[in-house]
Amino acid sequence: MNPEILQQDAKLAELVRRLVESYRPDRLYLFGSRGRQEAKPDSDYDLLMVLAELDAPAYRIAQHAHRLVWGLEISADILVWSRDEFDRRVEVKASLPATILREGMLLHAA
């Protein structure tokens, strides 16, 4: 996990707190330019939330999760995957999960 980035970025820390409180994810990753620590001041936040089970389609959960960004004055994309799907796809080197594990940051683990 990378608690240092959460200490340096109060808005990200608040978004992580909101997501963890609302969804209790298995894991929460930061990826993209911010995950690689190549972000510019106006870069968005790319987050992947891994849930034990999906109780609705992933896109619906992501739409609802995106509402938690409100009031933080940041731009964020939140993806949602089930634990099984993430773990299955991580074996494929060119997949998003594999890329996130290589280049991203783990922000939360249950």
Where is each model-derived feature located?
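Short beta-strand->loop micro-motif that forms the acidic, two-metal-ion catalytic signature
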Residues: D46-V50
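Catalytic core of pol beta-like nucleotidyltransferases
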Residues: M1-R27, G35-P41, L51-A110
